[in-house]
């Protein structure tokens, strides 16, 4: 994978026209399009408004990718396949139907990922436990099993998330608002076979767990760092509980 970092160069001519060289390009993969919240509709319209890209140097593919089928692992894998086969953008950004974000959130996430060399960088968002907005946890985990196979996930404390505005390394993030580089998706496909070379649901205690966990554990097994951007905080309209804190996988 090429480690060269190229950032947009934005120049304004005497006549006021703006020229962008080396724009950051991204395609948005929208999950659960049949149940999109109004805030997400607004987020997508704003993010794909490329009249703004001359000012911020980010070009978003206005034809976002929609998955097929009801299963998240299949849907996300289908999004990746479509992205690699039919899009020529540099980044795939998963934006779930229950996440509200702004174009500035998207631009900040992509600029940080590209400038700092993150191949996978998630925005920070919280999920309410049992639907109670007063009791939330950030969707990010560290693996406390240093040696041996499997994982023992421990959730980040919210106090650590709000303590800074930079990107920090973690082991597992949610895919609700996450940027993934094209080279890393191509790289993964060399090691994991179809039909699920990227996302899969790990099983523990006869229970299927999130496809985002499976994806991140595969990345970490390949030595790829995963980042959580504490300065990109987006809204998450989730009512179900799916806390993996303490989850042990073998």
Where in this protein do the model-derived segments appear?
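Active-site nucleotide-sugar/metal-binding loop of Leloir-type enzymes
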Residues: 77-91
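C-terminal catalytic/acceptor-binding lobe
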Residues: 3-12, 19-22, 189-250
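Conserved catalytic core of nucleotide-sugar-dependent glycosyltransferases
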Residues: 102-201
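Short beta-strand-to-loop acidic/aromatic patch adjacent to the donor-nucleotide binding site
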Residues: 88-100
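A short, glycine-/small-residue-rich helix N-cap motif at loop->alpha-helix starts
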Residues: 70-75
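Active-site phosphate/pyrophosphate-handling residues
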Residues: 78, 183, 214
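N-proximal low-complexity "stem/linker" segments adjacent to membrane-targeting elements
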Residues: 1-67
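Conserved acidic residues
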Residues: 61, 90, 119
């Amino acid at each position: 994978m090429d480690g060269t970092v190229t950032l947009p160069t934005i120049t304004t001519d005497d006549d006021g026209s703006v020229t962008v060289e080396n724009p950051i390009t991204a395609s948005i993969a929208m999950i659960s399009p049949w149940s999109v919240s109004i805030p997400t509709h607004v987020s997508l319209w704003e993010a794909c408004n490329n009249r703004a890209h001359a000012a911020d140097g980010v070009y978003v593919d206005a034809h976002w990718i929609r998955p097929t089928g009801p299963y998240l692992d299949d849907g996300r894998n289908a999004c990746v396949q479509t992205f690699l086969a039919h899009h020529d953008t540099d980044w795939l950004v998963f934006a779930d139907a229950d996440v509200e974000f702004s174009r500035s959130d998207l631009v900040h996430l992509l600029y940080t990922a590209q400038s700092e060399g993150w191949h996978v960088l998630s925005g920070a968002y919280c999920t309410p436990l049992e639907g109670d907005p007063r009791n939330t946890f950030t969707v990010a985990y560290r693996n406390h099993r240093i040696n041996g196979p499997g994982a023992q996930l421990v959730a980040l404390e919210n106090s650590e998330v709000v303590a800074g505005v930079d990107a920090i390394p973690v082991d597992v993030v949610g895919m609700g608002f996450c940027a993934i580089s094209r080279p890393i998706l191509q790289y993964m496909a060399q090691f994991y076979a179809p039909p699920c070379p990227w996302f899969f649901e790990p099983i523990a205690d006869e229970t299927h767990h999130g496809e985002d966990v499976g994806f991140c554990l595969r990345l970490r097994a390949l030595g790829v760092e995963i980042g959580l951007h504490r300065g990109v905080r987006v809204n998450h309209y989730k009512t179900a509980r799916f806390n993996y804190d303490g989850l042990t996988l073998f």
